[in-house]
Amino acid sequence: MSVFDSVRMDGQVAVVTGSGQGIGRGIAWALADAGCDVVVNARRLSDLEETAAGVRERGHRALIVEGDIRDFSDEIARRAIAEFGRLDIWVNNVGGSVESTTYELANMSDEFFRGMLELNLTSAFQGARAAAANMPNGGAIINIASGAGMRGSPMTGAYAAAKAGMINLTQTLALELAERGIRVNTVSPGPVVTEAYLGVLGISDQLEKLRQTIPLGRLGTIDDIGAAVMFLSSPAAGWITGQNILVAGGRTERSYQYGGRKQQGE
């Protein structure tokens, strides 16, 4: 097999949670481009139908499983096996924060904090557990975290704490599942242009200020994240496990601070 052929995953079956739109949709389409049949999951059927249509346009089968991922992972895995007879890749993409809702940790309720952990961290744990139970011949689990989980994140501390937990969850799962041939990695996106992201920031000079903190000079796209997940899922990444890949155009805590100082001096 050539290096170029090693990114192909013809005949493999992937589950992508939170794939109704945005990053999850981009991941589903990237995996279909690489040869996978894809199980798509989200809460809104209309969104899932569009994602599934994109998978089919790429020449592969799609299965829609509508529902809230929390406490639903085992059912998604069951349906994937029933429909396709195998499960090779599981992408935990469900997550996020409440749009336009920010709190300092000192003023945050227990309910809000627990809700962020359930949505972002517990759902990933449940998904990984369901995947591992249905990968007898090995496979790949990819957790979608965030650059926010790699640094302090004022006003979105619960979200950041959950994503940091996801990165550690990945490292532990990688060690526990290695002997079974299951690789586990994390992709941590930086700022990516999606409907949800624009809903928080709006189309304004805020986006330009954010762009100035990114060394490569642009915001990310869903294709950027999809490509990273496709690689980590493929045989080309067969000796990579337990890693967190920051896909953020070079944006780190240091570059973010540098960008902020630059703006203040303009």
Stretch-by-stretch model annotation:
Residues 128, 162, 170:
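Active-site helix of classical SDR
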Residues 101-105, 109-114, 210:
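Substrate-binding pocket helix/loop in short-chain dehydrogenase/reductase
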Residues 186, 205-240, 247-249:
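C-terminal helical subdomain
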Residues 2-6, 102, 151, 230, ...:
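Short C-terminal tail/terminal secondary-structure segment
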Residues 13, 20-22:
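Conserved glycine-rich cofactor-binding loop
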Residues 133, 175-179, 238:
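Alpha-helical segment proximal to the catalytic Tyr-Lys
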Residues 146:
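Residue(s) in the substrate-gating loop at a strand-loop-helix junction
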